[in-house]
Amino acid sequence: MYVVLEGVDGAGKSTQVELLKDRFKNALFTKEPGGTRMGESLRRIALNENISELARAFLFLSDRAEHTESVIKPALKEKKLIISDRSLISGMAYSQFSSLELNLLATQSVLPAKIILLLIDKEGLKQRLSLKSLDKIENQGIEKLLHIQQKLKTHAYALQEKFGCEVLELDAKESVKNLHEKIAAFIKCAV
């Protein structure tokens, strides 16, 4: 089963992924972008080079295609539980050029069975971002991240409606422990 955690930077995805590693020791943990060696190189170029937004979108789509082919599909074939920090949902939400059609091509229509969506309000996001050094995306401001968060939600529910992906929407301001228990229960009900 393929499970993804989605949310803007600062929502707590990475914290939850680390906790899930202790809970689901036999699962394959991965991430997008950069879940393969080639993907790490593409991610580095996409995030650090001065390139057009269209070129950046295609680098991320290339990363997604490689990740699907070399990580996701083999693990699904082996009937493994796959837990990914981000997916095509982030790809579509963060890019102005990344369509569902292009992402379905890149993923060969391999979609997550379950989507965990961590949502955070403006105040919570401000507080969390103030505690860390900001990357290029985070430096675009709170309003930009809240706009991306709305797109994440829209894309997650569109996948639910069109393809039957299950969505668990959570308030990222809940305690780390409560979030972990809800996420683990959501994953377990199909494992």
Curated annotation (Swiss-Prot):
GO MF terms, alphabetically ordered: ATP binding; dTMP kinase activity
UniProt EC number: 2.7.4.9
SUPFAM superfamilies for this protein: P-loop containing nucleoside triphosphate hydrolases
Keywords assigned: ATP-binding, Kinase, Nucleotide biosynthesis, Nucleotide-binding, Transferase
Protein name in the entry: Thymidylate kinase
Binding positions for ATP per the UniProt entry: G7, V8, D9, G10, A11, G12, K13, S14
Lineage: Bacteria, Pseudomonadati, Campylobacterota, Epsilonproteobacteria, Campylobacterales
Domain of life: Bacteria
Xref: PANTHER family: THYMIDYLATE KINASE, UMP-CMP KINASE 2, MITOCHONDRIAL
GO annotations of cellular component type: cytoplasm; cytosol
InterPro entries the UniProt entry points to: P-loop_NTPase, Thymidylate_kin-like_dom, Thymidylate_kin_CS, Thymidylate_kinase
Enzyme class: transferase
Function: Phosphorylation of dTMP to form dTDP in both de novo and salvage pathways of dTTP synthesis.
Pfam family, one: Thymidylate_kin
UniProt similarity note: Belongs to the thymidylate kinase family.
Any single biological process term in GO: dUDP biosynthetic process
CDD domains: TMPK (cd01672)
